[in-house]
Amino acid sequence: MNTVRVAFLLVFVLAVSLGQADKDENRMEMQEKTEQGKSYLDFAENLLLQKLEELEAKLLEEDSEESRNSRQKRCIGEGVPCDENDSRCCSGLVCLKPTLHGIWYKSHYCYKK
């Protein structure tokens, strides 16, 4: 029975000592993997950032072109003098001669349709 105890004790000691070595080795492997993972994540993050910046630049460029081409010119509001030939009244307004002609300085004003 002593030989069984000695054999069991020997196996136990070997298992504990080898287990500790594996634990340290595993810890070192995990540290290496996390360091590699961090560098990979940094690379992926930089790549994603570049793509987002390119996309943002493209969108801003489209917006500026769109606003430049479709920008409404300044218009004249209701009750403001306008030129009969070059009517810049806002939408929904028309350049008309007022009914009481002698009161106003100009002869045409923007009125609602």
UniProtKB/Swiss-Prot annotation:
Principal subcellular localization: secreted
Tissues expressed in: Expressed by the venom gland.
Disulfide bonds: 75-90, 82-95, 89-110
Taxonomy, superkingdom: Eukaryota
Keywords: Disulfide bond, Ion channel impairing toxin, Knottin, Secreted, Signal, Toxin
InterPro entries to which the protein is assigned, alphabetical: Toxin_22
GO cellular component entries: extracellular region
Signal sequence coordinates: 1-21
Protein family per UniProt: Belongs to the neurotoxin 14 (magi-1) family. 01 (HNTX-16) subfamily.
Domain notes: The presence of a 'disulfide through disulfide knot' structurally defines this protein as a knottin.
Name of the featured protein: U11-theraphotoxin-Hhn1x
